């Protein structure tokens, strides 16, 4: 926004919409299963999309509801789908990289891999570049160990030699 970009987004709650608008982000409600109002208008001047909505049991909801409008968005050039390393499955302590074939072993991983493929397939015959970012170990405000302990969500992970990546929430967007 400081560089002149206009940023828009969706949220599931009215409170989050209000918070986004308070910092200059145009925001609207998009709840799983409810299509956006006037999607053609919403997507008419969109150039970039960062998609972070977790897929549901029935699939990638944004595409199930709006793939036609997104494909018809003449100004759209780039999509980044935020996925998870869960698509690599259980590597028994081994390291996974983007060159490894995804072999999910959980429902979450299977759904995310299906969503990745849905985004890629939706734009496969267009000029839109689709990128997949598999992020893990998110930390930042609302995600610290102290906050997890206070909320009763803290976990102890004891695995000899385990390594993992960390990324600050501000560095994702």
Regions found by a protein language model. Name each.
Residues 120-164, 169:
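NAD(P)-dependent short-chain dehydrogenase/reductase
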Residues 8-14, 31-33:
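N-terminal Rossmann-fold cofactor-binding loop
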Residues 67-107:
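Conserved Rossmann-fold NAD(P)-dependent oxidoreductase catalytic core, especially the SDR/UDP-sugar
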Residues 92-132, 157:
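Catalytic helix-loop patch of NAD(P)-dependent Rossmann-fold dehydrogenases
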Residues 39-81:
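NAD(P)-cofactor binding segment of oxidoreductase domains
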Residues 49, 172-173:
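Non-catalytic, hydrophobic alpha-helical segments
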Residues 1-5:
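N-terminal Rossmann NAD(P)H-binding glycine-rich loop of SDR-like oxidoreductase domains
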Residues 22-35, 51-55:
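Rossmann-fold cofactor-recognition segment
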């Amino acid at each position: 926004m400081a560089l002149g970009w206009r940023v828009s987004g969706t949220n599931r709650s009215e409170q989050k919409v209000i918070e986004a608008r308070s910092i200059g982000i145009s925001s609207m409600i998009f709840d799983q299963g409810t299509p956006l109002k006037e999607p053609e208008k919403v997507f008419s001047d969109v150039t970039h999309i960062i998609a972070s909505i977790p897929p549901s049991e029935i699939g990638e909801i944004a595409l199930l509801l709006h793939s036609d409008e997104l494909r018809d968005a003449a100004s759209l050039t780039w999509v980044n789908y935020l996925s998870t390393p869960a698509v690599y499955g259980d590597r028994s302590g081994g390291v996974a990289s983007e060159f490894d074939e995804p072999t999910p072993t959980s429902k979450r991983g299977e759904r995310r891999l299906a969503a990745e493929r849905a985004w890629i397939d939706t734009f496969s015959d267009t000029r839109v570049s689709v990128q997949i970012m598999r992020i893990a170990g998110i930390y930042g405000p609302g995600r610290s160990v102290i906050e997890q302990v206070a909320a009763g969500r803290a976990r102890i992970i004891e695995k000899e030699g385990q390594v993992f990546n960390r990324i600050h929430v501000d560095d994702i967007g």
